Protein backbone atom coordinates (compact mmCIF):
# COMPACT_ATOMS: atom_id res chain seq x y z
CA UNK A 1 0.00 0.00 0.00
CA UNK A 2 1.06 3.56 -0.66
CA UNK A 3 -0.08 6.98 0.49
CA UNK A 4 0.37 9.97 -1.79
CA UNK A 5 0.75 13.05 0.42
CA UNK A 6 0.02 16.17 -1.64
CA UNK A 7 1.24 19.30 0.16
CA UNK A 8 2.96 22.69 -0.22
CA UNK A 9 5.61 24.30 1.99
CA UNK A 10 3.42 27.38 2.52
CA UNK A 11 0.33 25.36 3.54
CA UNK A 12 -0.47 25.72 7.26
CA UNK A 13 -2.75 22.65 7.49
CA UNK A 14 -0.10 20.60 5.65
CA UNK A 15 2.47 21.58 8.28
CA UNK A 16 0.00 20.76 11.05
CA UNK A 17 -0.53 17.28 9.57
CA UNK A 18 3.21 16.49 9.34
CA UNK A 19 3.23 14.95 12.85
CA UNK A 20 0.28 12.72 11.95
CA UNK A 21 1.97 11.47 8.79
CA UNK A 22 5.22 10.82 10.68
CA UNK A 23 3.25 8.82 13.25
CA UNK A 24 1.68 6.69 10.51
CA UNK A 25 5.15 6.12 9.01
CA UNK A 26 6.37 4.80 12.37
CA UNK A 27 3.31 2.66 13.07
CA UNK A 28 2.96 1.23 9.55
CA UNK A 29 6.50 0.73 8.21
CA UNK A 30 5.17 -1.46 5.39
CA UNK A 31 3.19 1.48 3.95
CA UNK A 32 5.13 3.70 1.59
CA UNK A 33 4.45 7.42 1.83
CA UNK A 34 5.29 9.60 -1.15
CA UNK A 35 5.34 13.32 -0.42
CA UNK A 36 4.38 15.40 -3.46
CA UNK A 37 4.94 19.17 -3.42
CA UNK A 38 2.12 20.52 -5.61
CA UNK A 39 4.17 23.60 -6.52
CA UNK A 40 7.02 21.48 -7.89
CA UNK A 41 4.97 18.55 -9.22
CA UNK A 42 1.80 20.23 -10.46
CA UNK A 43 1.33 17.74 -13.30
CA UNK A 44 1.13 14.85 -10.83
CA UNK A 45 -1.39 16.81 -8.74
CA UNK A 46 -3.45 17.40 -11.89
CA UNK A 47 -3.24 13.72 -12.85
CA UNK A 48 -4.80 12.80 -9.50
CA UNK A 49 -7.33 15.67 -9.68
CA UNK A 50 -6.03 17.26 -6.47
CA UNK A 51 -7.99 20.47 -5.93
CA UNK A 52 -6.91 21.42 -2.41
CA UNK A 53 -4.22 20.52 0.07
CA UNK A 54 -3.42 18.61 2.05
CA UNK A 55 -4.79 15.65 0.10
CA UNK A 56 -3.97 12.05 0.96
CA UNK A 57 -4.60 9.39 -1.67
CA UNK A 58 -4.41 5.74 -0.68
CA UNK A 59 -3.30 3.27 -3.35
CA UNK A 60 -3.43 -0.51 -3.25
CA UNK A 61 -0.60 -2.77 -4.43
CA UNK A 62 -1.82 -2.43 -8.04
CA UNK A 63 -1.65 1.37 -7.84
CA UNK A 64 -5.43 1.81 -7.83
CA UNK A 65 -6.98 4.49 -5.65
CA UNK A 66 -8.82 2.93 -2.73
CA UNK A 67 -9.36 6.02 -0.61
CA UNK A 68 -8.89 9.77 -0.36
CA UNK A 69 -8.90 12.30 2.46
CA UNK A 70 -8.74 16.07 1.98
CA UNK A 71 -7.82 18.59 4.65
CA UNK A 72 -6.66 18.24 8.24
CA UNK A 73 -7.93 14.98 9.66
CA UNK A 74 -7.37 13.05 12.87
CA UNK A 75 -4.96 10.16 12.56
CA UNK A 76 -7.83 7.68 12.96
CA UNK A 77 -9.48 9.00 9.78
CA UNK A 78 -6.34 8.30 7.76
CA UNK A 79 -5.67 5.03 9.53
CA UNK A 80 -9.04 3.53 8.54
CA UNK A 81 -7.75 3.29 4.96
CA UNK A 82 -4.80 1.17 6.11
CA UNK A 83 -6.86 -1.65 7.60
List the model feature ranges, each with a label.
Residues 1-7:
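Short active-site neighborhood of thiol/selenol oxidoreductases, capturing the structured segment around
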Residues 6, 25, 29-42:
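Thiol-based oxidoreductase modules, predominantly thioredoxin-like and allied folds used
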Residues 11-14, 56:
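The canonical Cys-X-X-Cys-His
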Residues 15-27:
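Typically the conserved alpha-helix immediately C-terminal to a functionally engaged Cys/Sec
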Residues 48-57:
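Structural micro-motif
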Residues 57-83:
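Non-catalytic, surface beta->alpha helical segment in thiol-disulfide oxidoreductase systems
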